Amino acid sequence: AHFNTRFQKLEEQVQALKGLWTQEVFEYQGAHIQFEAAYSSPKPAQPLGPPILIGGETDHTLRRIARYADGWLPRARHGFNPKDNLARLEQMCAAVGRPTDEISTSVFGAPADLEALKGYQAAGIDRVLLPLPSSEPSEVLRILDQYAEDILKGLT
């Protein structure tokens, strides 16, 4: 997609897909996507279609998430504050009249640090994706066991 129109196209694609997934016959007339009386079958197993997940942390992205997404994938980069970022998402949801609890949050690349993750949990983060190396299976399994012992037990 062209850089300047990529997000407009994304919004239209999500709207068009949701319409096809939820209506027997659907037509769409957008600036970039247009079609008449289209059918989509079989319908997805979930009544509203597969969840739409969008990643990013900018205000533009959070507005798109508030309008169209079922889940948010922020990145746990330096300076990521779960409480502040969730508050920003709540503002965007309030602006479009949508309850924030309809949107799951899965932090990508969260730190494998129990105290940091307790802060994520306290802020209302649904789930985190912890880093794993591209290593031998035995090493990956060792790290997963360590996460289970050091982190999961400390969060429950």
Positions of predicted regions on the chain:
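Active-site-adjacent structural elements that line small-molecule/cofactor binding pockets in enzymes
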Residues: A1-T156
